Amino acid sequence: MPNPLILPSFAAGELAPALHGRVDLAKYQVGLATCLNWFIHPFGGVSTRPGTEFVGEAVDPAARSRLIPFQFNTAETYVLEFAHQKMRVIKGGSGGTAGDGGYVLEAATAISGITRADPGIVTTVAPHGLSNGDHVWIEGAAGMSAINRRRFAVTGATATTFELADTDTSTWDAWTSGGTTARFYTLVTPYASADLPLLKFVQSADTMTLAHPGYAPRNLTRTGHTAWTLVALVFAPGTSAPTGLASTNPGGAQSYVMTAVNDESGEESLASAAVGAADAVSGVVFTPVAGCTYYNVYKHKNGIYGFIGRVKSGSTFTDTNIAPDTSDTPPIQRNPFAAAGDWPGCSTWHDGRQWYARTDKGPQTLWASQSANFKNMSVSEPTRDSDAITRTIASREVNEIRFLLSLNSLLVFTSGGEWKCWAGSQSDVITPANTSLKPQGYTGISQVPPIVSGNSALFVTPSGRKVRDLAYDLGVDSWQGKDVGILASHLFEGMQIEEWAHARDPDSIVWCVRSDGMLLGFTYLKEHDVYAWSRHATDGAVESVCAIQEKNETALYLLVKRVVDGRTVRYVERMVSRLFADVHGAWCVDSGRRYDGWNVDPARTMTIAGSNYAAGAAVALSATGHMPFSASSVGQKLILRAGQNQVTVTVTAYTGPANVTATLDTAAPSVTQAVAISDWAMAGATLSGLWHLEGRQVALLADGSVQPPATVVNGTVEIPRASGRILAGLPYTCDLETLDIEQGPPTLQGRVKRVQEVVLRVKATRGLAVGPDVRHLTEIKERISENYGTPTLLATGDERVLIDPSWNSNGRIFARQAWPLPATIVAVVPRLEIGE
């Protein structure tokens, strides 16, 4: 008698083959044998990963770039693409230009002509300011549609013309009018391509500090989409010292200096030039400093200057033979990063200071700015609590500091261990006098930056093959952690993690770039003991990732190396949101683009009216709230939809901007007749703009229905039937396999068994095939009551499938999604029959 057995969760992800016999582990019961292109939700279910949207070509197709996130707030987020001595900016969002998300462009210049030649020549209305080697974006050209929404390299530039490098336009349709060209915004940087992996960054508001031991530290500052500056840091007080000091009683018996105190920041300047006085009862006059009301006065005694008073207002100080306080002296200028060999390799902010660490000459040394004065490294003798700080790790080995991370203590990660930098008490503020460095462990970190998740840190060990977490343990008063990748150690055999990014919302997934180009997903939720790994393959190699917040979720951007039309290319792509409303919004292809002609404004409606609503009948089509028609609308197809009922029409004659005559391609259901409908679309049977996939076979989804694969020719694919939403991109397959079934005691291991039926509890799913293994799959039949001509709805609930009932020793269930459709499995219930 078959016995149902439920697998209610997969919260352990893919387990290493070495653990396939460890049925005694709690994680075994929620683990998987294969998890390819599925990711694990924190609640234990699994979903096929969303596809990626093509954002644009990378700066250099021949060299690897690096993606770095820049986030001012949740509404203003960017991805910075660093290439060899260049940086380009991608605005967070979806689309091809900064207006709707994509590469940021400079101001556009109108086009006055484009030749049909090899290479094509573009003429602009006004001087374009372009130089040879620049990249430009062209769009809006009438006639020569093949040139639109594409990137081109500039060569042969004159004041108002330029050639399109390596682009033969002689076979394209002739340009007739219009169009604009805009240069990709590019910032020149000093960083060579080979040095990008070691470039460290930390951001505060609109400023990002970049550190690398081979370059002077710099601040990258944003003031607008196309307004970025990269400036070497100058480590000196921002407040100027008073000038024009003079004594009312000149002489050499006494000597005075003054400093200015900034009204806003409280920063104290360096000391002014000294002025002499004849005796101890003298006046000092000076020229005030803009932005400063207070001035400190210091008098010389036994070789040092000591504090004697403050000028609160005015420009004169009178000394009445005040004894100098030599425990309070003026700041002494210091710049520890003045020359090559002294440039820091990492930075962060902590406890009101900016911290730096790891120079070639001081690989284990930390430096901190003055409190609240981030570019001021000045000190005093004796020291003040607000002075800059210098500390060097004292350890048995010289292990370079690689990262600084601010949590409730300053964590210092070296190549050989983890240290805590603190004041000796959690309630105290770090000062030069109480700074303490205490070891927390001796694992070490790779060159991959640590990630903060909640109040824990994740880091990659120096080998690149292990991931550990680190969290404060009150019981032992220390930072403790464990290997969180040990259950999936097979994913790192012979491979290393080279980059990663944390997509916090909605599923808290750390996306890791493996050295072979495979993308790994790590669902991590420490408080619920969720540590789940998965593998994600694309038709290419992932080389860089970063994550930025976009609206209510975190978007992952990827640099992917692909082969297209026989050429190696590198593309920036964006993982699309999986929070879609229905199958029409699903995006399950890679490097994809989509045409979307569906109306989104409920005030804009379409109405068909006539005496006959059979297929082939003529009707009047009118628009309310908008005027979408023109003479060129003849031949345009439209779809009007009311729930599961829809009708397709073809425009046959133009009457006016809001009225046309049309023919019904299909019979109009009664609910669509003579009714204003807001759910309508301008339909098409082609999708253009796919030049980045020229010659590749792509998967297609049109209005929620899978179409036959098609090959991209001249940047275009065709589908059999006009649709309002067409998605095209590279296909990928999603495979899921459970572990050997265990129901003991007594154990089922080694006993023959078979599964005749399996129940998949699914959510928003379509297109799954299931079986005992990859060679014996049965596709789930899901269409039930949908109207003809409408897509099959996504299923939620239990799907019962009779599968190949062969006897075997494992009782595994294999599920595959081979179509560009979504699937989510929340539980698997096999009906198990056990033999001897």
Predicted segments with their positions:
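Extracellular fibronectin type III
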Residues: D263-A278
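Beta-sheet-dominated scaffold domains
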Residues: L196-F201, R353, K361, S395-R604, ...
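Short, surface-exposed beta-strand/strand-loop-strand elements in extracellular ectodomains
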Residues: R88-I90, W419-K420, G424, G767-K781
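N-terminal beta-propeller domains
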Residues: M1-E106, Y215, N219-A241, V257, ...
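Beta-strand-rich modules
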Residues: G251-E264, N296, D319
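Glycine/proline-rich low-complexity spacer/linker segments in large multi-domain proteins
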Residues: A339, Y732-T778, V828, G835-E836
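Beta-sandwich interaction modules
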Residues: P190-K200, D342, E718-P720, Q749, ...
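Small/polar beta-strand repeat architecture
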Residues: P4-A26, G96-Q203, A211-P213, V284-G341, ...
